[in-house]
Amino acid sequence: MSEERLALSVRHVTSGYRDGGVLRRKGPYQEVLHDVTFDVRYGEILGLVGESGTGKSTLARTILGIVKPESGQVIHYTKRPQMIFQDPYSSLNPAYTVEWILEEPLRIYGKYDKAERKKRVRDMLERVELPEECLAAHPAELSGGQRQRVSIATALIQRPKFLIADEPVSALDVTIQAQILKLLKNLRDELELSYLFISHDLNVVYQLCDRVLVMKAGRVVEQGTVDEIFDHPQQDYTKQLLAAAE
């Protein structure tokens, strides 16, 4: 992993919402992120941890461009990031087959003929270790682990280099979690990916991530390598999170 090449830079970002949500422009402004600065290095998995309501999801939406920062910059050094969602039950359209779901981004955004789309879909299915029979299945016919593999394949089908994974294993049992974490790490190595991995589960973060970003009340209060954060935390808040996970 290179420490010099970056996948993403977030510089002094302050961001939030108007009352009524993301799209409403009227009403008082509610600041959620406060002067957030960090980098995601090319090829690394950066964990993002913090209690519910600390701004993790707002940060993800700001990076994706769904929420516009009031100040600061989000600088992408690769293609626009794609998202792996927490809940594969709701993120996959139940009306369509896996093949249709995987082909749809290529139909909309790519310049590929039918044969090229079919080949890329099958290649991606192999990458996420699913049998070809899954192509004809609807999401409801798959297990939770298989659905999450389809979600990962959907995020990767346009060949991005940076993924935001928002609690991607929290809905899975422990055995399947371990398999998905291994898959994510293998895909990182094989495809030279970078991840921002959002999780409330510090044990999962410890297993998967290279560095960790700790957020409290919309601010980054600590960041460092996994060993630095888990073995030598500096902030009381980080120590509290670690103690609660024991």
Where are these regions (language model features)?
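Conserved ABC ATPase "signature" region
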Residues: 116-133, 242
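A short, proline-enriched helix->beta-strand linker immediately N-terminal to the Walker B motif
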Residues: 157-161
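Helix-to-loop junction immediately C-terminal to a conserved catalytic motif
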Residues: 64
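A short, surface-exposed alpha-helical micro-motif characterized by mixed small hydrophobic
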Residues: 205-207
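Conserved ABC ATPase signature
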Residues: 138-142, 146
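The feature captures the beta-strand-to-loop junction immediately N-terminal to the Walker
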Residues: 49-51
